[in-house]
Structures are given as C-alpha cells and as structure tokens.
A protein has these predicted regions:
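Terminal, compositionally biased segments used for targeting/anchoring and flexible tails
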Residues: 4-150
C-alpha cells in the first residue's frame, strides 16, 4: 500500500476542484474591512499555495501567476479578493485549456455544494415531472393532429 502511495502521482483532476472550493471558501469568508495584520496573513497564505500544491509544475505555474497578477491590491476588501480568486482560477483554466467560467456562474456552482441533498432530489423529481408533462402534451397534440388529418 505504501509503495502505491509513493509511486502514484496525485491527479489534479481529483484534488484541484476541492482545492479551488477551499480557496473560494477562504475568499468568501475574508473580512469585509481587513486590517494590515489580516492582509499580511492572507498574502502569506496565497504565496504559500505554490509550495502546497502536490504537482510541482502546477505550483511553479501558480507562482508565475502570482508574479504576473499580484494579490496585494485585492486584499483591501472581501469583494476584490473574491474577484481576484475567480480571476486567477480562470487564468489557471486558460493555461490548462479548460473553459473559463463567468463570475456569477462560479458562485452558483460554489453555493450548489451547500444545497441539501433532499432539495436536490426534489428539484430533480420536479424537473422530470415537467419533462414528462411536456412529453405527454406533445404526444397528445401529435395524436390529435394525426387523427384529425386522417
């Protein structure tokens, strides 16, 4: 078992979505009006991310993004830090040839994870009922037209 852990590469497809979820959680819980100590701690956290990524190349790429798009000007407010986090996520997606996602869609996807499973199941059932209803209406209408023209 230990051998497999040492040999197996940690696939970004597995850990990266969780990583981005945690980063967005950190940004969304950032103080509205942070003081200098808080700004410094968050600055340090963001600048330590490249060291914490399990794939060295991705860590180096993230470090380059931090050089190109520094976080410092965006640590003055929660809003700007959230937008910077989203912007950086899109920059990483660009570099990986993944589609960019607009800000509000990203927030919707984030908050979807907090939706209780019972509500998700109810929403799915309601959607299926609507699809079934529309299908029945279309079939009935088609049958009426067919019989009328006959």
């Amino acid at each position: 078992f230990l051998y497999h852990l040492l040999v197996m590469a940690l696939a970004p497809e597995v850990w990266a979505p969780h990583y981005w979820f945690v980063l967005m959680t950190i940004a969304l819980s950032y103080p509205l009006n942070p003081n200098d100590v808080t700004k410094k701690k968050y600055y340090d956290l963001i600048h330590n991310i490249p060291l914490l990524l399990p794939v060295e190349k991705l860590g180096n790429d993230f470090s380059n993004l931090l050089d190109e798009y520094p976080v410092t000007p965006y640590l003055d407010s929660r809003d700007s830090f959230i937008k910077w986090t989203h912007f950086i996520h899109n920059k990483v997606n660009q570099s990986l040839d993944k589609p960019e996602i607009d800000f509000y869609t990203a927030l919707d996807k984030y908050y979807f994870h907090y939706k209780p499973k019972e509500i998700i199941n109810q929403d799915n059932i309601r959607f299926r009922e609507k699809v079934l209803f529309v299908a029945i209406i279309l079939l009935t209408s088609g049958l009426i037209v067919y019989l009328y023209k006959k």
